[in-house]
Amino acid sequence: MVVSAGPWSSEKAEMNILEINEKLRPQLAENKQQFVNLKERCFLTQLAGFLANRQKKYKYEECKDLIRFMLRNERQFKEEKLAEQLKQAEELRQYKVLVHSQERELTQLKEKLQEGRDASRSLNEHLQALLTLDEPDKSQGQDLQEQLAEGCRLAQHLVQKLSPENDEDEDEDVQVEEDEKVQKSSAPREVQKAEESKVPEDSLEECAITCSNSHGPCDSNQPHKNIKITFEEDEVNSTLVVDRESSHDECQDALNILSVPGPTSSATNVSMVVSAGPLSSEKAEMNILEINEKLHPQLAEKKQQFRNLKEKCFLTQLAGFLANRQNKYKYEECKDLIKSMLRNERQFKEEKLAEQLKQAEELRQYKVLVHTQERELTQLREKLREGRDASLSLNEHLQALLTPDEPDKSQGQDLQEQLAEGCRLAQHLVQKLSPENDNDDDEDVQVEVAEKVQKSSAPREMQKAEEKEVPEDSLEECAITYSNSHGPYDSNQPHRKTKITFEEDKVDSALIGSSSHVEWEDAVHIIPENESDDEEEEEKGPVSPRNLQESEEEEVPQESWDEGYSTLSIPPEMLASYKSYSSTFHSLEEQQVCMAVDIGRHRWDQVKKEDQEATGPRLSRELLDEKGPEVLQDSLDRCYSTPSGCLELTDSCQPYRSAFYILEQQRVGLAVDMDEIEKYQEVEEDQDPSCPRLSRELLDEKEPEVLQDSLDRCYSTPSGYLELPDLGQPYSSAVYSLEEQYLGLALDVDRIKKDQEEEEDQGPPCPRLSRELLEVVEPEVLQDSLDRCYSTPSSCLEQPDSCQPYGSSFYALEEKHVGFSLDVGEIEKKGKGKIRRGRRSKKKRRRGRKEGEEDQNPPCPRLNSVLMEVEEPEVLQDSLDRCYSTPSMYCELRDSFQHYRSVFYSFEEQHISFALDMDNRFFTLTVTSLYLVFQMGVIFPQ
C-alpha cells in the first residue's frame, strides 16, 4: 500500500540509498501482486460472462437473491475494514507529528537549561569574587555599587534565559525597568531622590499592557495559537477532532482536522484525545488547509484501491458460486481455475491481517514514545519553573542589596552576611538547574562554597587570630614522602610507600615495599636524626656525612649502637650501585647449626680502670664494650656482621650476594683455643714471630705516637683500599685449591716492621683463621690503622691491579679429609711491673724471655668472636670494626673489586677439624704430601 507523504522533510532527505531501496522493494512486490490480480480478474470476468451465458439457458432465478445478499454484506464488511484502516493510519500519522514536535521542544528546553546553568555559574563566581575581596576598603563606596550592578545585570540575564519564548516581550519590559533601577541605584542618592519625586504615578501602569504576571511564571509556557490547549495543574490536554462521514462516496472529507473554538463545542464526530505537550511555534503555524492538501492524494489513492478490492471480491464470490454450481455438471475444465481463485483469496486475507498487526505494533511503539517524552517534558518544565523562581528571588535580593534604605548598614558585617546569602541563593539556583546525574558534583561544589562563605562571613580579626595560633609543627604534616638531605645521590629515586612519624623530635622512617631488587634500591639510608636540628640543617644545606657523624657524636652520646646490627646498612652518600647485598648472609642449609645470640650491654664509660669482659663471638655476634679513658668511639660496628660499603665507593663493588658461610650437608666443629694475651707497657726483648698466611695472623704494631685511626675496618673480610690499580684482577681461580691430594702448606710470613723508632721486633702471632685481634696497650700509642683487611685477602695502598678478584673459594678442600691441628702458642709481651689479675697459662712459654710476670686473661677464641677491650690512655679510636666480619670496600675503589662472590669457606661433604698450633709459626698437616711456601713479599710486595 503506497502512501504519498508529501514533500520530504529534512530527516528524509538525509536517508541514504540503501534505506530507500529497502522501502521501495515492498512497493514493487505489491505492484507485481496487483498485476497478477488484475490478470486473474480479467480471466474471471471472461469466465463469469461465460457462466452467465450458460446460466441464462437454465434460468437459475433462485440464486439471484442470494447473490445480492452476499454482495451487500461483502460491501459493508469491506467498508468497515477500510474505515478502521483509515482510522489507524490517521492516528499513526498524528502520533508521528506529535513525536517530532516533542523532540524539538525537548531540544529547546535542554538548550535553555544549559544556558541557564552557564549564566548561574557565572553569577555565582561573580558573587564569590565580590564576597572574598582582598582589600576590604575597596569593597565599599562606588566600586561596590558598580559590582552589585553587574551582579544584578547577570541575574536579569539569567531570568531572561530561563523564560520561554512567548514571554520575551514581557521580559523586555521588565528588563527595561530593571536597567532603570540599576542606573538609578548607581547614581548618587540625592539625584535618585530628585528623580523619584518627578516620576508620575501613572508610569507604574505602563507595563500593565501585557498578559504577563511576574509572580506566576508557571503560566509562561502557553502557546497563543488556534489549537485548543487546556492547562490543568501543568498538564496539557490536546484534543484533536477528526471529521469523518459514514458514507463511502464522501471519504475525501475523512481526514479534516478541525479546530475547536471553545470548550463547549459539540463532539459528535469521531475524536481521538492525545495527551501531549504544546506544539512548537512552527507546527502551530501550519493551517488546516495545508494538511488537507497533503492528505487529498492519499485519500484518492485509498478510494481507488477500495474499488479494486471490491470488484475483486465480487468476482471472487461470483466465481465461487458459479464453481459450486458447476460441480453439479462436472465442468472439469474449470477445476484448476477455481482452486487457484480460492487459494488467492486465503492468501489475500492473511496478508491483510499481517498488515493490520504491523500497524498496531507501530502505533503502540509511538504511544510509548509519546508518554515517555511527555514525562520528560513535564520534568524539564518543572525544573525551569523552579529555576525562574530562584532567579527572581536572587534578583530581588540583589536589588534590595543595591538600594539599601540605610547606607550605614550596608557596610561591615551586615554587607558580608547579605552577600553570603546571595551566594547561597546562587548556589541553590545552580543546583536546581543541574540535571540529576550532576547532583554529586554539585554537592561537592556546594560544600566548598559553603566553607568559603563561612570563612568570609567571619570577622577578619578572628581569621588573623586563628592564623597566629596555628603551630609551626603543622607545616610538617605534609611531609609524607621520604627525603634524605644527607644523601643527594638518592634524590632521583622513586618514593614508594613511606610513613614518617614525628614523635619526641625523633624521625622514624618506615619504607614499605616488596623484596625485589628494584624496589630494594629505594630503601635508602635509615639514619637516626635528632629532629630538633632539622631546621638548622635545612638552613645550612646538605651536610657532609663525616661532619654529620661528628656532630651526632658530640651532641648525642651513642644514641643507638649498631643500628645496622646484623642487617644491611649503607652509610650516607653511598652511590646507588651498592644496593644489591640482597642475598642470604648466613645461610646454613641442611645442617645442624646452633647459633646463640648474646648481645652484651653497650656502655660508654669515660674513666674506668678495671677490665670488663663481654664476649662477642663471631657467629653469636657479640660485641665487647670498650673501656678507655678519653677514647672517642666514632662508630662502633655500624655494619656489624653484615656487608657494608662506606663513603664514596664506586659502582663495581656491588654483588656481595653469595652466602658467606655456607655449610652444606656437614657438621662443622670449629674450635679455636687462643692463649692469653699479655700486655706490657715497655717491651725490652725482641720477638721474632712468624705470621703465617693461612693462619691469617696479623702482628700488632707497638710504636709510640701511633694514631689508631680505625681498628679492623674490614675485620676478617675481603677488602680493597685506596686507589688500587686495575691490574690485580685475574686471581679469580682458586688461590689455594688443594684437590684430590694431601697438601701441607707452610707459610712463613716475614715480619712486618715500620721505621718509626723501632726498638725491638714485635710479633705475637695472630692467626688468620682464628681472627684474633690483639689488644694494643701502650702509653701514647697512636695506631693509624690496625688490621684494615684482617684475616682476608687484602690489597694495600697502591697495589697493582692484578690482585683484585679473589672470587673463587680461597681454601677449597674437596673430597678429602684434612686435619688441621693448630695450637696457638702463647703471645707474650714484656712490660713493666703492673701485674694484671687473671688466670695463668698452664702451658710453658717456649719463649721465656720476660721482664715482667703478668697474669694473662682467659683465652678468647676467634670463632667465639670475643673482642678484647682496648684499655689505653689517650688512644683515639676513630672507628672500631665498621664492617665487622663482613666484606667491605673503602674510599674510591676501582671497578675490578666486584667478584667477591664465591663461598669464602666452603667445606663440602667432609668433616673438618681445625686446630691451630702456633708454636713454630706454621701449620702442620697430619697427612702431608706437599709443602708449598708462599712469601707475602712475593704475593703482596710492599
Swiss-Prot record:
InterPro entries assigned: NBPF, Olduvai_dom
PROSITE patterns in alphabetical order: ODV
Tissue expression remark: Expressed in the mammary gland.
Keywords linked to the UniProt accession: Coiled coil, Cytoplasm, Repeat
Biased composition (Acidic residues): 165-180, 530-539, 550-562
Compositional bias ranges of the Basic residues kind: 831-849
One Pfam family named in its UniProt record: Olduvai
Major site of localization recorded for this protein: cytoplasm
Bias (Basic and acidic residues) ranges: 190-201
UniProt domain Olduvai: residue ranges: 165-259, 436-528, 529-617, 620-675, 676-767, 770-843, 844-904
Any further remark recorded for this protein: Encoded by one of the numerous copies of NBPF genes clustered in the p36, p12 and q21 region of the chromosome 1.
Name of the featured protein: NBPF family member NBPF8
